[in-house]
């Protein structure tokens, strides 16, 4: 199993520890990607407010998800006080042609990339959390929006 890249919010110097993902994304690009997701080297509101378990901001995946030749990254953070019963949230960021990073999607829950695709080759994302009827997000050329729901108890 691939090691995870953990972003230490306590360190003002944007300390990043990694075993394998660091090889996939240069340090400066990691910092830009975290910044696009809203994590800029200070403690997040989730980290400050959390009284129970807190999972630090982590870069879970670095991969070209839409086939444009540029890397994309999935960033997660765990906190029941910020993300409710799901206990986790995700941020999908993408490197743009100008070298900047853009937030493509963020939700409470876990992201599961599906084989189906929206515009520009972006994979649909099933947002998994508590329950058994989950939204599926599809990229429409501007942003990810709820496209449909999947699960045992969905009545569509």
Kindly give the residue locations of the regions a language model identified.
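Short glycine/acidic-enriched loop and turn motifs that connect beta-strands
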Residues: 79-82, 132
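Acidic, small-residue rich beta-repeat scaffolds with periodic aromatic anchors
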Residues: 4-6, 20-36, 114-156
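Bacterial N-terminal signal peptides
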Residues: 8-17
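Acidic/hydrophobic-patterned starts of short beta strands in beta-sheet-rich repeat architectures
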Residues: 66-78, 92, 119-129
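Beta-propeller blade termini
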Residues: 56-67, 109-124
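Terminal domain-start segments
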Residues: 19-63, 156
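Beta-propeller blade repeat segments, especially FG-GAP/WD-type strand-to-loop junctions
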Residues: 22-32, 41-43, 85-105, 136-145
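Repetitive beta-architecture junctions, highlighting loop-to-beta-strand starts
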Residues: 58, 88-90, 132
